Each structure stands twice: as structure tokens, then as C-alpha cells.
């Protein structure tokens, strides 16, 4: 009896210390982000306009709608104005909530007003505080996932350490707080933690129910927070499908997870204003195909030749049904969603060539290119990449070993002990190996996906070096005889992470402290002057035209209407962006005037940084991409060069001579910006 009490006490103490460490890690990371953000932007010493300028591009748009919700007389009125928004983009009414996934802003505005925070904290601090808090939950979820897989909270501590040290590659929170991924990925991390626990073979009934409920809630929330979430869940379903093939024992559990996806898609479709993108998504087609195939599956003796044939037929059936269902859905469901994404992928993988400005501009973005050598060097210097590769190889080979044993009809143990050394037989390990390979393969093509992949690299590497099972699997292969393998595995699972942790502390902790001590300065006086002039001098009904990134800042800082936005999920907005960018091309004053007046623009803003851009890669500057699209620059051999008799508009308009002064009158300028009033009555001067 006393022994049982001791065991229960030890287990409780282990869980308590682990939970305390997980929560503390998340809280410390959130506080670190807050302190670093203050040091970088000096928020507490700045005026509201100067704070808002720190939100760049699409981040400015998201935060501007949060401000609009707080200004609305009621929540219902605020939602209505966002869903029928005609005060942002000229000549266009948009459902901003659906198109931009503004559910985070709706929730943040409700919480701000419902909690009475208006008297305590400014709206901007409340907003970024929620995001930093979610990042703390993100880190806590990664901690728990690694802990569940390895059995020791030491793995969670190492996961957090690697995550923070490699934060340049794990998160974009430092550069752009309101991004959808910063709101969504913490819920995805919670979902993966719950899924990991749910897939474990030794979980009790209450644990399964808790994990299932947490998985359901986090899957749905993740889907609501980010418009691209269903693509990430699609990769997850592929991983679960392959797990179902390789691990017969988990078939029923995997089928229950499929129901979560169907429920989340159905609820998301209704609450996202009947979003057609969810109906035509590959996620829905694949899950529906898997559930249909499950209904048609025959019960035969496991390990028999017939069972193997049925597995192959089932795989082929699922693939065929998925493609068929997706084609049928696209035939009957009207949609325009993400057509530009397919075109981009065609060009990215060399399946098509284009001179289109938007496609080439996207290809030139650093986040959409292949990873650089610096990326791999950073991961190697922090010791993350070498240990990840080691852990992945051992788990992958062990998984293959288990698969071949199944193919040969050999029975597997119901309970796996440490002495067996078969880490690849655990269903949660099989899932994570497949998932990380899929994510890693995509991240090798598109660098921006590293922010999804690297956090799980941290988690998997930390789990591996802290897992006695992984070391035991390696020793089984090496047939170690000199030292007792179980004892050595237990020692290494404690010693290796301790040595890694101490080396990381010695090398990187002083750097983190130095970053918090250093006062950085982000100040853009030219943009502040421009926004101040607009608010004081421009008519309230004025419409501004310029680069999409600048238009986002104008919408946030002034509230004035603009002609375009830095959003890339709408074909009309993409076309607008391309047309407005023509102010940096070799087009006539009359052409530019017609383009701008077609969007009812009253003012044009020319940015000196774009007009005189000296980019590191020739052909990736905005003016080069425009010249290629307009045929004024040779892109490939055999292209026909079209000579333009006009100079570059952004240069010519500054000189103030006819015909440019007939159409445009300069009303304001500073070192970075030139503002021109678009004349309604054209006066021709000689």
C-alpha cells in the first residue's frame, strides 16, 4: 500500500513539475516578447500615429479594422460595417470579415470592451498583449507535445530553448504582430499536442476524451483564424492516412479524427458566410474519400495476402475518390478562391512561364524562394539541425523496420517496452515522422513555410535526444554488448540534453540578454509627416493611390479611402495593384491618368524608394518587373523588345513640365514621398 502511494506521489510530482515548467516557459516567452518589442519600438514613449506606423503592409489593414470595431456604436453595427465595407477600397464593397479572416479582431474588440479594459489599458497594448499571450500558449503546447512523446519534461525545456534561440526561423512575431499565422498557429500547436496524446496506445478513457475535445475545439478555431489553415490540415490528414495504413491498431482512432475535420469544415462553412473555399478545398475531398473508403472496407484477417492487396486497393481508391470529388465540387460550387495560387505554383515549379507582373513579383519575394545557405548555417550553429537529422533518421528507419515486419506477416507486441528498442512502432511517432517530412519537403521549396516546420523540428529533436527509447533503438541496431544498453540509454537521455542545454545557455543566453538591454530605434519621420499632412489637408472624401503597402498604412493612420490594399487572395485587388504600380513604369501621363481616374483616385503618392530602387537582384525590382510585363525589357532569349517613347513616369512627373503638369499638380513632398493632386479639369500648357 505504501509503495503504491509512493508511486502515485512520484507521478503526481512529475506531472505537477512538468505542468509548472510548461506554463512558466510560456509566460516567460510572452514577457520576453513584450520586453523586446518595447525596446525595439519604444511604444511607451511614442504618440499613437508613430505606434501605428510600426504596423506594415497587411498588418496595418488588420489592425485598422480592430480600431474600426472599437469606434463602432455597437458590436452588431461594427460587424455589419465590416461585412458590407465600402469605405476602404474605392468603387468596391467587400466582406472584410470573410476575405481577410478578421475573426481575431472581432474577438479582441469584444474582449476589450467586455472586460472594461478601456479605463486600464490602451487598445494597441491590449491587442499586442493578446498576440503575445497566444505565443506563450504556442510555446507551452510545443513543450507538452515533446513531453508526451519522450515522457520527460526535460524535452519540453529543450524544445523551448531551441525555439527561442532560433526564433528568426520559428516565428515572424517580431516583424509583423497582426499576421494571421500569429493568431492561428498557437491553436494548431494545441491541436497537435492533443492529437499526440490521443494517438498514444496507453492512454486511458478520460485522457482520450479530454484530448478529443481539445482537438475538436482547437481544429475549428485554427480553421476560423487563418484562411490557409485547410491546406495545413490537408497535410495532416495525409499523415494520418499513411499512419492508418501502417498502424492497424489506430484505425478506429484515426476515423474519429476524420469526423472532427468534417464537423469543423461544416461549421466553418456556415460561420464564414458560406465560404466556397472550404467546399472546394482538397481537405474536404480527401476526408470525404477516406470516410467513404472506410465504409467500403472489408474485414479480413490481418497480415494475410488478401489484406495486403486490400490495403493497396484502398490506397488507390482514396486517391481516385479524392481527385474525383474535388473535380465535382469545383464544377458545381461557384468559386474564385486561390486561382492565383495555382498559377504561382505552376510558375514556381517550372510548369509554365509568364511575364505577368503579379506572378513574377511573388516569385521575387524572399519568403517564397528556396531557403538560403544562411538558414541551414543558423540551424547548425544552434545544434538543432544535426540532432534533428539524427533523430529523424533513427525514427524513420525504425518505422520502415516495423512496416516490413507487418508486410512479412510478423505479429507485433501489444505493449512496447524500453528493452524492445522499437520507437518506430509507436503510432504518435509514425505520425510526427510523416508530418515533419511533408512539411520539411515544402519548406525546402518555399522558405516562408519554415515558420510552420521549424517549431516542430525543435520539438522532434528535443523529444529524440531525451527519449531512452530512441537511444535503445540505436543500441539494438549496433548490438551494444560492453555496457548494459538500457542503463546507457537512460544515462544518455539525461546527459545529452543536459550538455546541449548548458552549451546553449553559455553561448546564446548572453545574446538574448544583450538584445533586451540594447535600445533600438524605429523612427520614420517622412511617413509621420505624410500622414499628418493627409489628416490636416486632404478632404475627408479623398481617395489615395500608391503602392499597396503604403495604402495599408494610410488606411490605418488616417482612415481615408484608398485604391488598393496589400492583400493577395483577391483577383480584383491583384489587378488593381498591378495597374496602380504602373506609376513606376514607362507609360505616358495620359495612360496613368486614365488608370487612376478609373478608380476615382484624387491623390497620387510616388515613393522615392521604389522609383529609385537599387535592388540586389536585377529583374526583381518593381520597375524591372513592370518593364518585363510591358515588353520594355528582354526577359528571355527570343523575346521581342518594345521600345517606349516615354520616360519612367515617376521620374518625369517630378520635373513639372507638360503634359505631366496638365494632369497632376504637386501639393506636398518630402525626402521620401511626392503627393500629386489628380486634376479633374485638364489644363493644357505649352
Swiss-Prot record:
Q: What class of enzyme is it?
A: transferase
- Give the transmembrane ranges: 15-35, 124-141, 147-165, 210-226, 232-248, 255-273, 279-300, 312-333, 384-404, 429-449, 452-472, 485-505
- Domain of life per record: Eukaryota
Q: Which residues carry this modification: N-acetylalanine?
A: 2
- Do you know which InterPro entries this protein is assigned to? Dpy-19/Dpy-19-like, Dpy19L4
Per the database entry, which stretches of residues form a coiled coil? none
| Bilayer topology annotation | Multi-pass membrane protein
- CDD domains in alphabetical order: Dpy19L4
Its family?
A: Belongs to the dpy-19 family.
Protein name as catalogued:
Probable C-mannosyltransferase DPY19L4
The organism named in the record is Pongo abelii (Sumatran orangutan)
Amino acid at each position: 500500500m505504501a509503495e503504491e502511494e509512493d508511486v502515485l506521489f512520484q507521478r503526481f510530482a512529475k506531472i505537477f513539475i512538468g505542468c509548472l515548467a510548461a506554463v512558466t516557459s510560456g509566460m516567460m516567452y510572452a514577457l520576453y516578447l513584450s520586453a523586446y518589442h518595447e525596446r525595439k519600438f519604444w511604444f511607451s514613449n511614442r504618440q499613437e500615429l508613430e505606434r501605428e506606423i510600426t504596423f506594415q503592409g497587411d498588418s496595418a489593414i488588420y489592425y485598422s479594422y480592430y480600431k474600426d470595431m472599437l469606434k463602432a456604436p455597437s458590436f452588431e453595427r461594427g460587424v455589419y460595417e465590416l461585412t458590407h465595407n465600402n469605405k476602404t477600397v474605392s468603387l468596391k464593397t467587400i466582406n472584410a470579415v470573410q476575405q481577410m479572416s478578421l475573426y481575431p479582431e472581432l474577438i479582441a474588440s469584444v474582449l476589450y470592451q467586455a472586460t472594461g479594459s478601456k479605463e486600464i489599458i490602451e487598445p494597441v497594448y491590449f491587442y499586442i498583449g493578446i498576440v503575445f499571450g497566444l505565443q506563450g500558449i504556442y510555446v507551452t503546447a510545443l513543450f507538452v507535445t515533446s513531453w508526451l512523446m519522450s515522457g520527460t519534461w526535460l524535452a519540453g525545456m529543450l524544445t523551448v530553448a531551441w525555439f527561442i534561440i532560433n526564433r528568426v526561423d520559428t516565428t515572424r512575431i517580431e516583424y509583423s504582430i497582426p499576421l494571421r499565422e500569429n493568431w492561428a498557429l498557437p491553436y494548431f500547436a494545441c491541436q497537435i499536442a492533443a492529437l499526440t496524446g490521443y494517438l498514444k496506445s496507453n492512454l486511458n478513457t478520460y485522457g482520450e476524451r479530454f484530448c478529443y475535445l481539445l482537438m475538436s475545439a482547437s481544429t475549428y478555431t485554427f480553421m476560423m483564424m487563418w484562411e490557409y489553415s485547410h491546406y495545413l490540415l490537408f497535410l495532416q490528414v495525409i499523415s494520418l492516412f499513411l499512419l492508418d495504413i501502417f498502424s492497424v491498431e489506430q484505425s478506429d482512432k484515426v476515423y474519429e479524427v476524420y469526423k472532427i475535420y468534417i464537423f469543423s469544415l461544416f461549421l466553418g462553412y456556415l460561420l464564414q458566410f458560406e465560404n466556397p473555399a472550404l467546399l472546394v478545398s482538397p481537405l474536404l475531398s480527401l476526408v470525404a474519400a477516406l470516410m467513404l473508403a472506410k465504409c467500403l472496407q472489408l474485414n479480413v484477417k490481418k497480415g494475410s495476402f488478401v489484406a495486403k492487396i486490400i490495403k493497396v486497393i484502398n490506397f488507390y481508391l482514396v486517391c481516385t475518390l479524392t481527385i474525383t470529388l474535388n473535380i465535382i465540387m469545383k464544377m458545381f460550387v461557384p468559386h474564385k478562391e486561390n486561382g492565383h495560387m495555382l498559377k504561382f505554383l505552376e510558375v514556381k515549379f517550372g510548369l509554365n512561364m509568364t511575364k505577368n507582373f503579379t506572378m513574377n513579383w511573388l516569385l521575387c519575394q524572399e519568403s517564397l524562394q528556396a531557403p538560403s545557405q544562411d538558414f541551414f548555417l543558423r540551424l547548425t550553429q544552434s545544434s538543432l539541425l544535426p540532432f534533428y537529422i539524427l533523430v529523424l533518421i533513427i525514427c524513420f528507419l525504425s518505422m520502415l523496420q516495423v512496416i516490413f515486419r507487418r508486410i512479412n506477416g510478423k505479429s507485433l507486441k501489444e505493449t512496447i517496452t524500453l528493452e524492445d528498442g522499437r520507437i518506430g512502432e509507436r503510432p504518435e511517432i509514425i505520425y510526427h515522422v510523416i508530418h515533419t517530412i511533408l512539411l520539411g519537403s515544402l519548406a525546402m521549396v518555399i522558405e516562408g513555410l519554415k515558420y510552420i516546420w521549424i517549431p516542430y523540428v525543435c520539438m522532434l529533436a528535443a523529444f529524440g535526444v531525451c527519449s531512452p527509447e530512441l537511444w535503445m533503438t540505436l543500441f539494438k541496431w549496433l548490438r551494444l554488448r560492453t555496457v548494459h544498453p538500457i542503463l546507457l540509454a537512460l544515462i544518455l537521455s539525461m546527459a545529452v540534453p543536459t550538455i546541449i542545454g548548458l552549451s546553449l545557455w553559455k553561448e546564446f543566453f548572453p545574446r538574448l540578454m544583450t538584445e533586451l538591454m540594447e535600445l533600438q530605434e524605429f523612427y520614420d519621420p517622412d511617413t509621420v509627416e505624410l500622414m499628418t499632412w493627409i489628416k490636416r489637408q486632404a478632404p475627408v472624401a479623398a481617395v489615395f493611390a500608391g503602392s499597396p503597402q503604403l495604402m495599408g498604412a494610410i488606411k490605418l493612420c488616417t482612415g481615408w479611402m484608398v485604391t488598393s490594399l496589400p492583400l493577395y487572395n483577391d483577383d480584383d485587388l491583384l489587378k488593381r495593384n498591378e495597374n496602380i504600380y504602373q506609376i513606376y513604369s514607362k507609360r505616358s501621363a495620359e495612360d496613368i491618368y486614365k488608370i487612376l481616374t478609373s478608380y476615382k483616385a484624387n491623390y497620387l503618392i510616388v515613393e522615392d524608394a521604389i522609383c529609385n530602387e537599387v535592388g540586389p537582384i536585377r529583374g526583381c525590382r518593381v520597375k524591372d518587373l513592370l518593364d518585363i510585363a510591358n515588353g520594355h525589357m528582354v526577359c528571355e532569349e527570343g523575346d521581342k523588345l518594345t521600345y517606349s517613347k516615354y520616360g519612367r513616369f515617376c521620374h518625369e512627373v517630378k520635373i513639372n513640365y507638360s503634359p505631366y503638369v496638365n494632369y497632376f499638380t504637386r501639393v506636398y513632398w518630402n525626402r521620401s514621398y511626392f503627393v500629386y493632386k489628380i486634376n479633374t479639369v485638364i489644363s493644357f500648357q505649352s
